[in-house]
Amino acid sequence: MVNIGLSKVDDAIVAKHPGLQQYVACQSYAFMKGTASFILGTVGIFFGQRALQKIIKYPLQWNLFVSIVSSSVFSYSVTRWETMKCSDVWLFLETGNIPDRNSDKEEPETSADSTTTQHEDVLE
């Protein structure tokens, strides 16, 4: 048995997915990085607003509101970015290919034969 967080994963599953422990460690790091960015962002923006409050007067509740909302957006973007990197590592460890997120989507090919559907079903 292998511990992943609070749950235990069977050895057969770990053997089937060799990159599982690296992926879980990467995800844990991504979530901790997002949490840290939320806390540090809130504190930094709050004290930055307190310094600006000498110039622009507005109530403390708006300081808290703006700090929390902007830090939430920042934290979400950091966590999302790190999670995408973890997903890329997982796909690389599972398939051996590096996923290309910048490739253009190919349009589906239209067949010249109108008697077959896109699922290769023949119409009579």
Curated annotation (Swiss-Prot):
Organism domain of life: Eukaryota
Pfam families (alphabetical): TMEM141
Transmembrane intervals: 29-48, 60-78
Membrane topology of the entry: Multi-pass membrane protein
UniProt keyword annotation of Transmembrane present: yes
Keywords on record: Membrane, Transmembrane, Transmembrane helix
This protein's record includes keyword Transmembrane: yes
Residue span of region Disordered: 97-124
Subcellular location: Membrane
GO terms for cellular component: membrane
InterPro entries on file: Tmem141, Tmem141_sf
Gene3D superfamilies to which the protein is assigned, alphabetical: Tmem141 protein family (1.10.3350.20)
Stated family: Belongs to the TMEM141 family.
Protein name: Transmembrane protein 141
Biological classification of the source: Eukaryota, Metazoa, Chordata, Craniata, Vertebrata
